[in-house]
Each structure stands twice: as structure tokens, then as C-alpha cells.
Swiss-Prot record:
Assigned protein family: Belongs to the TRAFAC class translation factor GTPase superfamily. Classic translation factor GTPase family. EF-G/EF-2 subfamily.
Gene Ontology CC terms: cytoplasm
Described purpose of this protein according to its UniProt entry: Catalyzes the GTP-dependent ribosomal translocation step during translation elongation. During this step, the ribosome changes from the pre-translocational (PRE) to the post-translocational (POST) state as the newly formed A-site-bound peptidyl-tRNA and P-site-bound deacylated tRNA move to the P and E sites, respectively. Catalyzes the coordinated movement of the two tRNA molecules, the mRNA and conformational changes in the ribosome.
Cited HAMAP family: EF_G_EF_2_B
Organism whose genome encodes this protein: Azoarcus sp. (strain BH72)
Annotated PANTHER family: RIBOSOME-RELEASING FACTOR 2, MITOCHONDRIAL, TRANSLATION ELONGATION FACTOR G-RELATED
Bridged cysteine pairs (disulfide): none
Classification via Pfam families: EFG_C, EFG_III, EFG_IV, GTP_EFTU, GTP_EFTU_D2
Annotated GTP binding sites: 17-24, 88-92, 142-145
Subcellular location: Cytoplasm
Name of the protein this chain belongs to: Elongation factor G
């Protein structure tokens, strides 16, 4: 089937922002202007098209990144039709993983900032993720109609806080109540949108006299930024003192795709102004799948291979999201990097080396769907019928295996025990949790061996609350939830050498394993490392993997309180064996015994997760908030002034002290402060805390 849209006219973009910067509203407007939505859905009354899980509508925050397709020809209808795949990303810090997984499959992103709040803590996290995956981006300053709106302040904050290089291509005309439209610095015209047509109609006017000077100054900066794209443009600029519209766009596009600059726009999505110009900027400055380097991966011989964004290449795609749908069961969202996928075809899951048949292929418009027969290179779609695939795995042509770069998911930092309210729901709860864990790799489920309880783990209290809520809504299982538990770890402070001997010789075939190991602290974050330093075959080669395995099986249960052991290096340097009685199991046992004994002598310590906490509070309550953080063993690391008499406090606080913080903060500040927190690192717990934790586990 011929392409309806050439691949050069595809744009796979994410819309990303801090909570309440107006991201979902912005997406809604995009769907409206691109002709998909007839009535605009407002988040205020819980009707936004993109926020499609019932919970999102109640809480007014976006949790799952729904992928939506729409078309755009430019607000002047001056472009050939382009196809946008928009991935909506959540802004809440407990869902950072969702942002990460969408960044992995995007070609470009629109960063939405609030004209009043500016660059907020979560914006910094999202920016870091976009930088990590080298995603070109635009910035859109939203809510220009709100009191306290200041476009230029956000430009400065982007430079200071994000170390970004924003290049405004429009300037606001007026602000707050007086916000009318924008000055287009490329055309040097004012764009005024018509309110009666909900922004569908607009007109170009002359730039208001009072803005002419500013417009010329900012235009010069923009043209200079464009000219730096290459020597030809720079020479032309130096000769003529200006560049043509086309050359400006070419220069800005080149540098945006190289992640050197970020074109910056502004508007108010709620009042239907400015989003239309941003859509044009997506076409002008963000890359199509062929403008970015071919995707890299490894083949079945671990050799690096690349795939170009071309229908003629062999098929390769990344499964970036799983969702359970009430009508069709499990949906697997895929980004196709190369080749073509047809419904009914068999594909290879190269990570698990399993073949699967694709049932139907759907393209989503938020939660409405259209069935399609094939999905082409550069496109995003949802597949039905894949049983074994989990997030981050590669699907490819069985004749040309490739494994694309995997996504790295963080380990959970908080656990709670859950049990169904009625015994009969035990099995149903197991199925529900299994489904939810397949959808979200930062959520884990396990059964505690000692107590038999079901333990769920996640990235924060809100994360787990939402999981429990979804069990009730989607699977009809009500659960009782225990008190949250912290994921402590154990480590060591000094290096020791230790012998381990496992000998059983009582008639018949015996057991004999004997090792000497050196246990020492490893660099933070390095995890477990095994070094084989055996000389002269004192431990035969075939038993060395058994020693490694014996050590690894001992790691989950430390000697202090049974928490997992991290950041240790173990060197096997000596030992002995018996011709008849030695076997793998004996060496596994010997290694395990040596490790436990060594651990006791190596000054074991307890590590606790530390959270980066950012509180925004009115100045009047600052003393209370800081006192409370200190009482939670928090270390305040910095303070900033925010607009409107607000203060921002950055602190590092142990997770163990943060339970129930939301409620406490509300009562300390009469509900006027907000906070966000994300996992930072593990650090040694003070002696008194460690002793209390250890005695509770005994």
C-alpha cells in the first residue's frame, strides 16, 4: 500500500511539562485545530480527550502517555499535509518512568512551561531525560493570560536552571488580561487570533509601535542563532546583515535538530492563542524520522547494526508501552523504526527469542481507535494479540534479528503489603497485579517468603495509591493496604579475606567445596562485581560459575537485617577441591558460607534511600516548613525566590521520614504549599536509625 504521507512529513513528538503547566489542555487544542475534535475537552471539568483513564479525570493529572495521530497543513494552509503522532507524557514525579519511556521513542518534544510558575523542579527532570535521549525540543510558554505571566522571565530561567539555549521566534503582545497575540519574528508581523472562532481564524497586522524596538532586538538574536548553523549562512549574514525567511528557518532547523538551540514560542492554550503557531514550528523545526541518525542495536552475534527509517529495510520496532483495554485485552504500543508491519504477521521478540503473531493493529486517538492493516517505518501504533512482550523489548523480522538499546528502569524505593478484602479475590488480585506490573516496569510484585504476604513496590506513595485504585476500578478487586516499608540496602565499609569450606564425607559420595574470597567495598552504584583470580587450577574452571552463583544467591539477604547487599566486589583467589567429592553444589555452598562470614567482619552498614525534595511555599510559612524538614532528618540544600511571594526550598530527606508528608505540609501551610520528590541515592543510615530498623526485623 502506498504511503498516504511521505515519511519526511511525519513528526513523532511528545508534549511534556510540569503538572499544571497546561500540557493536556495544549494537546487538546492541537487535536481541535487539527480537525479531530469538534468540542474542546477541558481538564477543568474532567473531559479532556487525552486523559483517558477514569482516575486521571478525577485527579486532573495525566498518568498514562496515550499516543494520538492527527494531521496539520499549517495555520495559513501553507504546508503540504503533515502527520503528527503525539505522545502525551505525565508531569507528576512519581510517573517519571512514563516520561522516560516516551522520550525513548520520540523524535522531538514540545516543552510546555507556565508563564507564571516558569521552570519548575519537574521540568528539570524532564529536561535531563530529553537530553539523555538527545531529543530536539521546542519550548512553549503557556498561560500568558494569567496574572503574573512573564515570558522573558521564563527565557532567563531556561538559561539558568536548564542550561538551555532558548531562541524566541515570537514575542507576546501584552500579558495577563491584555494578552492579544504574538509578534512573529521571522515574518516581522503581528498575529492576532479571533476569539469568536476559538482561534481558528487569525489575521496578520503591523507590529504595534511600542514593540517595534524589542522585536528588532530579538529578531537580530534569532537571525544570529540561525546564521551559526553553517559557514555559508554566516557569510551571507555578515555580508547582508540579514537572512531571508527561508534561510532563517533552515538555520534554526539545523541547529534545533542538533540539540544546540530550542526555538521558543508563547500563548494561552485555554484562550486558543498561540498553539497554532507552535504547530507550524513543529513542522518547521522538529525532525522527521529520516532527519535523525538511524537507530542502533546489536544482532544475534552481539555485533552493532543500524536500521534506517525506510519501508524497504527489514522490520524493527520497540514496544514502549503496554495497556490493558476493556474491549480488546492487552495493547502493545510500538514505534516502528524500519520496514513495514502487517496485521497477521509473525514477528520475533529478539530479547526473549520468541516468535509471536500480530493480531490486529490499531491507531489510537486518545481512547478512540481505528483499525489499520499495516504500520510503516517511522509510525506509532498499538498491536493486539502479543502475549509475551514487555515494555522496552524489540520486535523484528525473524530473518534479521536485532536488539535495540534497552530502556533502563529504576528500582522501586517503597514497598507496601496488600491483601484482598475478601479471600475469594486472592487469585483475581494476583492476575490484576501481574497485568499492572507488565504495563509498568517501575512497579514490582513479589510474595514475601516468610510472611506469605503480597508485597508491591513502586516509585512513591502516589504511584502505589494509583495501582491499588486501578485494581479496584479495572479488575474489581478491593484491597487492604499495609503501612509503607522502605527499601533499605546493606553494604560494607572495609575489605576482608575469608575462607569458606563445605565438606560432607560420610560413606558413599561426599561433598567437598573450599574457597578463599576477598570481599571489599565497590564504588557506589556499581553493584556486585565478581573477579576470578584463581591461578594453577586450585579451583577447577568448571566450578567457578558455581562460586559466582553461590555469592549472587546470598546477596538478597544481608547479615544485618536481611536486606539486599549492594556495591561489593568479591575476588575468588584460592581454594581446593576433591577429585571425587567436589561438585557445583558444594562450591556454591562454600561460597555462600564464606560471603556471610566475610560480611559480618567487614563492618556492615545499613543504607537508606534519600529523596530530593522540593517544596514551594508562601514566604510566611517558610520557617514552619524548614523546621519540619529538619525534624525529618532533612538537609536543606538551597532556597530560591519564586514569583508571587513564594519560596522554593530544596532538601535531601530520607524516604523513611517522608510518609504522610503531603497531609502534614497541607496543615502547616493551610494547603498553599506544594512539593515534589524523587529518588536521589542511597546513603548510610545513622546508627540510631539502623539499630531501630534492625531490631524491628528481628
Amino acid at each position: 500500500m502506498a504511503r498516504k504521507t511521505p515519511i519526511e512529513r511525519y513528526r513523532n513528538i511528545g508534549i511534556s511539562a510540569h503538572i499544571d503547566a497546561g500540557k493536556t489542555t495544549t494537546t487538546e487544542r492541537i487535536l481541535y485545530y487539527t480537525g479531530v475534535n469538534h468540542k474542546i475537552g477541558e481538564v477543568h471539568d474532567g473531559a479532556a480527550t487525552m486523559d483517558w483513564m477514569a482516575q486521571e479525570q478525577e485527579r486532573g493529572i495525566t498518568i498514562t502517555s496515550a499516543a494520538t495521530t492527527c494531521f496539520w497543513k499549517g495555520m495559513d494552509l501553507n504546508f503540504p499535509e503533515h502527520r503528527f503522532n503525539i505522545i502525551d507524557t505525565p508531569g507528576h514525579v512519581d510517573f517519571t518512568i512514563e516520561v522516560e519511556r516516551s522520550m525513548r521513542v520520540l523524535d522531538g518534544a514540545c516543552m510546555v512551561y507556565c508563564a507564571v510558575g516558569g521552570v519548575q523542579p519537574q521540568s528539570e527532570t524532564v529536561w535531563r531525560q530529553a537530553t539523555k535521549y538527545k531529543v530536539p525540543r521546542l519550548a512553549f510558554v503557556n498561560k500568558m493570560d494569567r496574572s503574573g505571566a512573564n515570558f522573558y522571565k521564563v527565557v532567563d530561567q531556561m538559561k539558568m536552571r536548564l542550561k538551555a539555549n532558548p531562541v524566541p521566534i515570537v514575542l507576546p503582545i501584552g500579558a495577563e488580561e491584555g494578552f492579544k497575540g504574538v509578534v512573529d519574528l521571522i515574518k516581522m508581523k503581528a498575529i492576532i487570533w479571533d476569539e469568536a472562532s476559538q482561534g481558528m481564524k487569525f489575521e496578520y497586522q503591523d507590529i504595534p509601535a511600542e514593540l517595534q524596538g524589542d522585536a528588532e532586538t530579538w529578531r537580530e538574536q534569532m537571525v544570529e542563532a540561525a546564521a551559526e548553523a553553517n559557514e555559508d549562512l554566516m557569510n551571507e549574514y555578515l555580508e547582508n546583515g540579514d537572512l531571508s525567511e527561508e534561510k532563517i528557518k533552515l538555520g534554526l532547523r539545523t541547529r534545533t535538530i542538533a540539540c544546540e538551540i530550542q526555538p521558543m514560542l508563547c500563548g494561552t492554550a485555554f484562550k486558543n492563542k498561540g498553539v497554532q503557531r507552535m504547530l507550524d514550528a513543529v513542522i518547521e523545526f522538529l525532525p522527521s524520522p529520516v532527519d535523525i541518525p538511524p537507530v542502533a542495536g546489536v544482532d544475534d552475534n552481539e555485533k552493532e547494526v543500524t536500521r534506517k527509517a525506510d519501508d524497504k529495510e527489514k522490520f524493527a520496532a520497540l514496544a514502549f508501552k503496554l495497556m490493558t483495554d476493556p474491549f480488546v485485552g492487552q495493547l502493545t504500543f510500538v514505534r516502528v523504526y524500519s520496514g513495514v508491519l502487517n496485521s497477521g504477521e509473525t514477528v520475533l521478540n529478539s530479547v526473549k527469542n520468541k516468535k509471536e503473531r500480530i493480531g490486529r493493529i490499531l491507531q489510537m486517538h486518545a481512547n478512540e481507535r481505528e483499525e489499520i492493516k499495516e504500520v510503516l517505518a517511522g509510525d506509532i501504533a498499538a498491536c493486539v494479540g502479543l502475549k509475551e512482550v514487555t515494555t522496552g523489548e524489540t520486535l523484528c523480522d525473524p530473518s534479521a534479528p536485532i536488539i535495540l538499546e534497552r530502556m533502563v528502569f529504576p528500582d522501586p524505593v517503597i514497598h507496601v503489603a496488600v491483601e484482598p478484602k475478601t479471600k475469594g479475590d486472592q487469585e483475581k488480585m494476583g492476575i490484576a497485579l501481574g497485568r499492572l506490573a507488565a504495563e509498568d516496569p517501575s512497579f514490582r510484585v513479589r510474595t514475601d517468603e516468610e510472611s506469605g504476604q503480597t508485597i508491591i513496590s513502586g516509585m512513591g506513595e502516589l504511584h502505589l495509591e494509583i495501582i491499588v485504585d486501578r485494581m479496584k476500578r479495572e479488575f474489581n478487586v478491593e484491597a487492604n493496604v499495609g503501612a509503607p516499608q522502605v527499601a533499605y540496602r546493606e553494604a560494607i565499609r572495609k575489605a576482608v579475606e575469608q575462607e569458606g569450606k563445605f565438606v560432607k564425607q560420610s560413606g558413599g559420595r561426599g561433598q567437598y567445596g573450599h574457597v578463599w574470597i576477598k570481599l571489599e567495598p565497590n564504588e557506589t552504584g556499581k553493584g556486585y562485581e565478581f573477579v576470578d583470580a584463581i591461578k594453577g587450577g586450585v579451583v577447577p574452571r568448571e566450578y567457578i560459575p558455581a562460586v559466582d552463583k553461590g555469592l549472587q544467591e546470598t546477596l538478597p539477604n544481608g547479615v544485618l537485617a536481611g536486606f539486599p547487599v549492594v556495591d561489593v566486589k568479591v575476588t575468588l583467589f584460592d581454594g581446593s577441591y576433591h577429585d571425587v567429592d567436589s561438585n557445583e553444589n558444594a562450591f556454591k555452598m562454600a561460597a555462600s558460607m564464606a560471603f556471610k562470614d566475610a560480611m559480618r567482619k567487614a563492618n556492615p552498614i545499613l543504607l537508606e534511600p534519600m529523596m530530593a525534595v522540593v517544596v514551594e511555599t508562601p514566604e510566611d510559612y517558610m520557617g514552619n516548613v524548614m523546621g519540619d524538614l529538619s525534624g525529618r532528618r532533612g538537609i536543606v540544600q538551597g532556597m530560591d525566590d519564586l514569583p508571587g511571594g513564594m519560596k522554593e526550598i530544596k532538601a535531601e530527606v530520607p524516604l523513611a521520614e517522608m510518609f504522610g508528608y503531603a497531609t502534614q505540609l497541607r496543615s502547616l501551610t493551610q494547603g498553599r504549599a506544594t512539593y515534589s520528590m524523587e529518588f536521589k541515592h542511597y546513603s548510610e543510615a545513622p546508627k540510631s536509625v539502623a539499630e531501630a530498623v534492625i531490631s524491628n526485623r528481628k
